[in-house]
Each structure stands twice: as C-alpha cells, then as structure tokens.
C-alpha cells in the first residue's frame, strides 16, 4: 500500500470558551500581542474540526490544524491500538501560556517555555501527496509565525510506504535582523497505566525540586515506573549518550521509541500529574472518559530552563521519529533499524525480543562474551513479525563482565547492545545533591564580565529591562566592556531608539574594530 493522504472533518464533543479578551495582555510580556483564552465554560456541544489524514498499511495518522496543528491520533494498524493517548473530547483547562489547553496526541511548543501560544488556535496546513515533494511518501506540514518573536516554525509529519514510523521534521527560522531566543519541545501524551515503564538511557536526572538525582533508582525508589510517582513531577535526563528513549506497557505488550540525533534533540523529559488524588483531579478537568495521561517530551535542549539565541535570519531544521513497538516483551535498546529486549535471568537464561521496522529475512540475533558466541538464532524480522525467545546462554553468561547482543541482516549490523549498558559503568561528572546550581555571587561583588553574562541570561529569559540595568551597571564598572555596548545597542534597536543604538554600537567598534557583531 502506498501512502494516502486526504482531508475531511471529525466531530468532537467540545467544551466551549467565551470570547477571547479583546485587549492585548500588556502585563504579560511572554504572550503580547496575543490575548488571553481564559473564559472557560461548562457547556459542551459537538463541533466539526478539519482533519488531515496520512495512512499506509501500518499506521493511520490524523492531524488537527485548528488545534495548533497537533497530531490527534496515530493508530497502529498492526497492533490494533492507539500509539499515543487519544482524548475523545476537546476539554480545555487553564494550563497554556494563554490559558486554555487540551491534552492528548503530540503537541509542538515553540520559542517560549510552556504550552504554545497557538495550542488552541488554527495554524496553516498543507498536504504533500506521494510524487510531490514528499517523494514516495506523503506528508502534512503545519506552520505559523509566532507573533511574540515574529519567528516562523513548521512541522512536517510524514509517512513512507511500508514504514511504521511517524516522521517529524522540525523547521525554525528567525525572520528578524537581530538575535533572539528560541526553544522547542515536542510533547507526546501516553496513557497513564499502572504498568507503564520508562526507557531512558541515563543514570542522572533532574527531578522536580530535588535537584540532581540518581536514575532510575533513587532512595530505594524506581523512577522509571509510573506507579512510583505519587505527586506531580518532571524528570529531565542529564547524561544521555544515546539517541533514543521511550516506554513500554507489559500488560499490552506494546510501547514506543523516540529517535533523534542527540546533537539536534538532546532533551528527554517525563511528566506526570501523579497517582494521588491531587493529581487525578486533572482527569475530570481535561477529559470525560479517556482517563489519565503522562507526557514523554523530546526537546532541543537538556531541560526546559534553557533557551539559546538564534542569529539574525538563522534557520535550523532536524528530524525525529516516533516508532510504535509491540510483541517483544519490553525493550532496552534501539537503533535506527531495530529495537531489542534483553533480560538476563538466573542460571544464564535470558529473555530476548527483537523487532525491525523494515523486513529482514534470516536476520541473526546473537549473544557473545569475550568474543565467544554463547547463543545465536536466525529469524525473519519485521514490524508485523516480532521475535521473542528464551535463550540458554550457559554459565559463561553469569561469569562474564559484559555481554554483547547484536542483530545482523544482509551483511550489516542493525543494532549492538552491551549488557550492562556503558552509561551504567562509568561515574557521571554530575554530583547527586539537593541543589544542582550554586548560589549566585551577590551582584555588588560581580565583575563587569559576570554582569554581562547575567544580562545575557536575562535577555534569554525575555527580561529586557533587567538586561539593560545589568549592562549599564557593567559599564559603570568597566567602561571599555564593548560587549555591554553591543547588548544595549541591540535593546535600543529593537525598541526603535535608533540614535541611541548607533551610539552604543559605535562605541563598541571604537573599542574594538574587529567587533563584527557591533559592525553588523
């Protein structure tokens, strides 16, 4: 089956909102010139939404442009289940930057920390059919211009023939002639079932208000198990050296892998409202019949306290995939080609499971120790042909310092897994403790250079008046600090104070004729 794409409408029970605030929210700099969407009503009615569809023989995807361009549904036709948490109603609660927010599917958050300005607003959308720019596959691109920064974002959701993975291509562009901050996280909702297991290849994490903690075991508690999170919290992995993360549901024998080059998408987050009553109230606030959800998020940066600058007119893009798994009993490792489950038990017996997204006939799965093969078996692997077995590795497996599991096909190595994983063998450079950031130096003791760095951080966080104050203070302490003149010149330029901007930038050039930022 080729990839088909079409548009129609779907009807969803929708809890109504009153009119948006007619006035721009001047007191909320993080949303200006957007208005608030905070008049949430208790009445509901059936509403039709434009739905864009992609479908191949393995996956059926629905995107809703009128709800921020979110992926509303991704149905795994092989396993017969929704890949993500599908919320059958549109029931907003006060969560997003502008107020109203709905749960479910995959949402895309840009430029400012929090649920995006357009999460409950229509965005542009277009379809690329097979044979167009999408090649053999088909794709849906949703896009918008963020009014707070005038930067452009676009997400292309694509399917390929015979490929069970949902492809996500991210494009960001700074349309302005000055630097400005940016931020990106893809937020996938999944059902909050008691047996949910996280697969995050890390051994340190930033855990809510606890600072840096050991992961997954912390104070006798396995943080990789959803049921062990009684209260609402976030987990951000900190020392990830792999390109994957995801989850698995043993009861359903199904799960999910997210894959992306960590040079482009290093952030790996888990969020839950918690299992106690205080967290479960969000079930009634956000849905009618679909239960609780959790979030697996993939981000541009390590955690959501980080912004970076985009240069003037800079554009950037990268690729991510979401791959549904099933029938392999869990998973511990993944590559671009394969996913592996490996559980070593007593007396050298191991549970082994494997899956590949494309078909490989006669693939070889092998377990070795000290370059000696302890066990191997051949199998036909594919998305609709998961492989599982119990392998008898013998006593040598219990004595070996490490085991190497490989999946090979067609003369290529599709996956290599070292047990125990490399990231568990060496100490992290991060120290576990109640605080993961030192107390800042008092401002009156800061050097001009330190004040400049604080001003940059304030600019990154959108606190421009604070940045101005810090750069002016830096110049009081060192009048030859050209970087402070550049910072003030940029602030003045953005505010239309062109003569003041010219004076600051000229002073920076006079101090250093090689200051190309000031010359620009």
Regions found by a protein language model. Give the residues of each.
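Extended, loop-rich substrate-binding clefts of extracytoplasmic carbohydrate-active enzymes
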Residues: 16, 20-47, 51-55, 103-164, ...
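TPR alpha-solenoid repeat register
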Residues: 484, 518-519
């Amino acid at each position: 089956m080729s990839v088909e794409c079409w548009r129609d409408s779907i009807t969803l029970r929708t809890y109504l909102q009153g009119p948006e605030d007619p006035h721009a929210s001047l007191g909320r700099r993080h949303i200006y010139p957007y208005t608030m969407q905070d008049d949430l009503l208790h009445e509901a009615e059936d509403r039709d939404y434009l739905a864009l569809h992609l479908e191949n023989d393995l996956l059926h995807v629905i995107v809703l442009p009128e709800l921020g361009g979110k992926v509303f549904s991704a149905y795994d036709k092989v396993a017969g289940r929704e890949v993500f948490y599908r919320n059958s109603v549109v029931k907003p609660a006060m969560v997003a930057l502008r107020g109203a927010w709905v749960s479910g599917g995959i949402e895309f958050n840009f430029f400012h920390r929090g649920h995006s300005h357009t999460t409950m607003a229509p965005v542009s959308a277009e379809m690329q059919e097979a044979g167009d720019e999408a090649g053999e596959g088909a794709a849906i691109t949703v896009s918008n211009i963020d009014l707070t920064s005038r930067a452009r974002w676009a997400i292309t959701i694509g399917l390929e023939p015979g490929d069970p993975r949902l492809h996500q291509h991210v494009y960001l562009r700074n349309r302005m002639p000055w630097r400005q901050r940016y931020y990106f996280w893809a937020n996938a909702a999944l059902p909050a079932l008691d047996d949910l297991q996280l697969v995050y290849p890390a051994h340190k994490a930033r855990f809510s208000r606890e600072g840096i903690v050991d992961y997954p075991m912390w104070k006798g508690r396995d943080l990789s198990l959803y049921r062990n999170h009684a209260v609402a919290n976030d987990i951000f992995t900190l020392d990830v050296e792999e390109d994957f993360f995801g989850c698995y549901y043993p009861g359903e024998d199904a799960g999910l892998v997210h894959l992306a080059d960590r040079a482009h998408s290093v952030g790996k987050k888990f969020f839950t409202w918690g299992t106690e009553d205080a967290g479960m109230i969000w079930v009634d606030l956000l849905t009618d019949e679909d239960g609780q959800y959790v979030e697996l998020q993939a981000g541009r940066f390590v955690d959501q306290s980080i912004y970076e600058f985009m240069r003037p007119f800079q554009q950037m893009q990268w690729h991510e995939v979401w791959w549904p798994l099933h029938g392999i009993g869990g998973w511990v490792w993944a590559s671009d080609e394969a996913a592996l489950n490996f559980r070593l038990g007593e007396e050298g017996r191991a549970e082994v499971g494997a899956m590949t997204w494309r078909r490989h006939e006669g693939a070889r799965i092998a377990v070795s120790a000290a370059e000696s093969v302890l066990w191997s078996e051949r199998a036909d692997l594919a998305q609709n042909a998961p492989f599982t077995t119990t392998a008898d590795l013998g006593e040598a497996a219990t004595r070996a310092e490490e085991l190497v599991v490989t999946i090979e096909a067609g003369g290529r190595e599709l996956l290599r897994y070292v047990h125990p994983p490399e990231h568990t063998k060496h100490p992290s450079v991060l120290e576990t403790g109640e605080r993961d950031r030192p107390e800042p130096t008092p401002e009156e003791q800061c050097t001009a250079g330190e004040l400049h760095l604080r001003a940059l951080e304030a600019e990154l966080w959108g606190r421009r008046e604070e940045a101005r104050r810090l750069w002016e203070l830096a110049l009081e302490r060192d009048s030859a600090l050209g970087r402070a003149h550049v910072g003030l010149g940029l602030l003045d330029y953005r505010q239309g104070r062109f003569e003041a901007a010219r004076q600051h930038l000229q002073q920076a050039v006079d101090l250093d004729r090689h200051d190309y930022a000031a010359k620009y």
